[in-house]
Amino acid sequence: MQIGNTSFRRYGIGKVLYELYTKFTYFLPILVSNYKFRHLLLLPLYKEKAAANYYPGGNKKVIYMVINESTFSGGLSDRLRAIVSVYQECKRQGLDFYINFETPNLIDYLQPNEYDWRITEDEICYDPKECYPCTILTYHTDIKDPYQRFVQRTLLRHFLKKRYRQIHVYSNMVTSDAVYGKLFKELFRPTDDLQKLIDYHLKQIGGRNNYISCTFRFRQLLGDFKEGGDMLLKEEKEKYIQRCLVTVVHLHEQYPGECILITSDSNTFLKRVSTLDNIYVIPGKVVHIGFTYNADRQVYMKSFVDYYMLSYARIVFLVRDKLMYHSGFPYRAALLNDAEYLEIMLSQ
């Protein structure tokens, strides 16, 4: 009998073996990646930095880390959900929590709200004898899977128990939907520059909860975004764009009179969709923060504006098909201010 057989995994020894198999497949990739990234990337990098770094000591610190070399942590929403997850556990244990987020420099866009998470470079220890860098990555696509959250939380608690002065966490681990918005707001509020842009666009579009949003996540399909994934042939791109435009038209038919905020990683598509009636597009170029380290501050700013503007929509839609990426960005934004979230299939 195969372990994937439904009858086999429901009863007796089959049930026991299936549970062990399931636990193994959740824990193993996270542990293997932690070993790999620690020994092949982080520890050699830390040894180089330790030679030029003096650490003054102090209380045990837990630091969520983003450095240019840590592309494995994913995009903006992946990192924000992990920050909230690590903060939640530190709050539960009474541990000091900090964020070191390079490229973009997080403090240019989000500032501390109720909890001060700022830390300076000279407060960060890179001596492997004093600090423990670790990774907790997400390998199962179902981010709502409670067992995945359990496994990641268990490993985080294991790492936090280690007897080092600092624990550096590199992660895109998932968090509980129920607490995300609350904990995010404890940590963050927009900087003055970001808030001005949010206020401007809210005024232009009609205010909070007076519009709906629709997100298209193409990756490299249209050939104008730096990330992984397939690229459509030239003759296929126009047909695909037309299908996307028809999807927006159908959405207008379902919600007549509603202004639709369109967000996307494709400037090509944003230019095309902006010609439709009652469409709002936030100007600016979009980049993936895991693949772009040298963009202008205002380029990174657009991702944060998009995030907040999605959160203030009445309904947040994500367009899906077998080619487009199942982005967590609009879903996480919807959680921020309790917007309704729906996924719709691309028109044929």
Predicted regions and their residues:
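Secretory-pathway glycan-assembly enzymes, especially type II membrane glycosyltransferases
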Residues: 3-6, 14-22, 26-238
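Short beta-alpha junction loops
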Residues: 101-107, 266-267, 346-348
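Catalytic donor nucleotide-activated moiety binding site of glycosyltransferases and closely related
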Residues: 215-223, 245-296
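Structural motif
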Residues: 211-212, 259, 315
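A short helix->loop->beta-strand "cap" motif at the edges of active sites that frequently abuts
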Residues: 95, 256-258, 337-342
